[in-house]
Amino acid sequence: MSEPGSPCFLTHFAVLRDPRQATKVLYPLDEILLLMLCATIAGADDFVEIGLWGSEHQDFLRRFLPYERSIPSHDTLCDVIAAIDPELFKSCFLAWVDGLRTDVPEVIAIDGKTSRRSHDRRKGRLPLHTVSAWATGQRLVLGQETVAEKSNEITAIPLLLRRLELRGALVTIDAMGTQKEIAQTIIEGGGDYVLSLKENWPATYAEVEKVFADPPAALKLQRCQTVDGDHGRIETRRHTMCHKVDWLFSDRRYPGEFQFPGLAAIGMIESETERGGGVATERRYYLCSKKLDVDTFARVVRSHWGIENGLHWVLDVVFHDDLARLRSGHGPANMAIVKHTAMNLLSQAKPITSLKNRRKRAGWNQDYLEKIIQRTA
């Protein structure tokens, strides 16, 4: 599919099957993928903009591939992307990311996001909801799984986890993903978990809340405190870690076994936020399969929220994901992969400026764009 001198990411997508009839193909699939990625990196947000960008940058694109029939129309781009097998596309993305990262992520944050304007009321189609895996330290999207209609994140998260290399990583998930089956999937994959515990597990939550409210001295809790402040807000976080968990009741069906496989520690964070003369307090509890020291626990939980600012916010503000109106076929799911690919490449680019400015620079400077897409993997 790819040619000598073409961007190396294309080699990882070479196994993609072209959904079109071979006798009717005017624009090769690798040319379409290269156009989609380059234009998205350079600032194009929809198929019309991608087509316009391609028409104005044909000489640049021909540095890598022939483009003998010029640039496809935006309708052709839309039809092809909507028809590509999303499962195979995801597998290609995962293979590419595995080559891109240089080490095992310490923390992998799992969280979901809805593309708000991808719904189609006329056809009764709900907005696209995608669960993504984010390497908090490397700031890389590791993978994604589309949540099926009439389903939820609980069914999508295990599918995503089984696609990932989890050995040696800590997986963090909010309360929606605090499920026994998900914990088991992480353990079986060689990883460890830090799962948020809320009232959706009422008996477990009540027991943990009761013990942490008046902990026995025998528990030998570890504690640390952090203070942050900005824009008139001061937040004090008191972290507590308990490595002794045999006081937590077991699964009644299997006496002596914890409800959550591999449970080794329980943590609590009490946050106190001062703003405008008022004070708000909140307590959050976490189930952990690894006996983290309290400072590591504090850092891991804090890093989980990097997926909100580092991924979801960037997709909405830099890539205008919430404004995208793509609705047909597999288009929304496949475009999410294109944006994640563009975002990963931009995240690795230098100099270190905002992704918004890196994206603008790629649109203005073809040599800079070439360096980005030629990132070896």
Question: What kind of region is each of these model predictions?
Answer:
Residues 1-23, 73, 84-87, 91, ...:
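Charged, often Cys/His-bearing segments associated with DNA-binding zinc-finger transcription factors
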Residues 8, 15, 22-173, 178-181:
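Conserved, well-structured functional cores that handle cations and Mg-NTP chemistry
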Residues 16, 57, 314-377:
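A short, flexible helix-boundary coil/loop motif
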Residues 22-32, 276-278, 326-334:
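Structural motif
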Residues 50, 287, 291-326:
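Short amphipathic alpha-helical "interface-anchor" segments enriched in bulky aromatics
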Residues 86, 98, 162, 191, ...:
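Generic secondary-structure signature for well-ordered alpha-helical cores
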Residues 134, 142-232:
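Nuclease catalytic cores that cleave nucleic-acid phosphodiester bonds
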Residues 198-303:
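An anionic, glycine-rich sequence signature occurring as long contiguous blocks
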